[in-house]
């Protein structure tokens, strides 16, 4: 089976989310949790941030000697040397690919930047680093510019090109066409870096792989600037395996704990319907669905909850039917007759409407006691 590398950037791009700032202990713990989940390649920081960030990167390196670690650098000799001194495996050297960024960010012509790029690739090689060229804002760059960058990278040589949809403007069809065009002029590795401004980062990531990308950037919980990055720890990784038939090496059962760790460190809530890891994604209420699930657990689930170390859960609410009421109470040790089910169902529906949620087990017991228990029988007597 073909393998695609997940190069997670939670600790670099993910931490660029407004308000997200990991302590040293959190950064190390997240790196360890990523590694335990089978995500062994990660972009761990930016040396340009200063001594504290450098110390954090150094500690991650010490704790994970077998992980494949990358730093993000500008075209700057000091930052590249700092990365080498830290024992990092890869350096991503960023170059503004679009006319807009070159004009307003660096104010230098492409020809000058390409000369410098070749020099910095050579420097990184002499320091024992593998080189990825980060084509920043590639989705707004011309094909001619990307070909020129690829030619310099090929001759230097660099090992990987990162295609960054920096402002998240791509759709899957354009992504596939762009990566395919890049593959025509570049024989090395291609890494897709997708942002989620239009809600298509995961789809664009899969499209890139289908067109020839060999690695993808991801973040836990989809953290990142603006609308975030591709959350490949969940739908992207599983989508790569299920939809494209490629191997990622991700241990999916470890992902809920990883997500919880990052959520706590980032002070972000996990949406209850977040794919794969949300509290409600393996929870069923609808009467038709529950009736089928009670007979066959795969009838309304394409993903086995056990893959994530979880199990499916039945709850009662406004859309529940009689079989669901009977099934849930049976799991609680209550064996209902038809008359009791008919009494309970409207009360459960009223509860859901009034409280805007499903009743918890103890609340179901209270409803049962009120309507069907011995006290209710005595009241009627």
Curated annotation (Swiss-Prot):
GO terms for biological process: biosynthetic process; carboxylic acid metabolic process; nitrogen fixation. It holds the Pfam family HCS_D2. Keywords: Nitrogen fixation, Transferase. It catalyses: acetyl-CoA + 2-oxoglutarate + H2O = (2R)-homocitrate + CoA + H(+). InterPro entries: AIPM/Hcit_synth_CS (IPR002034), Aldolase_TIM (IPR013785), LeuA/HCS_post-cat (IPR054691), NifV/FrbC (IPR013477), PYR_CT (IPR000891). This protein is a Fe-Mo-cofactor biosynthetic component. It comes from Klebsiella pneumoniae. GO terms for molecular function: homocitrate synthase activity. Its EC number is 2.3.3.14. NCBIfam families: nifV_homocitr (TIGR02660). Belongs to the alpha-IPM synthase/homocitrate synthase family. Residues 4-256 form the Pyruvate carboxyltransferase domain. This is Homocitrate synthase.
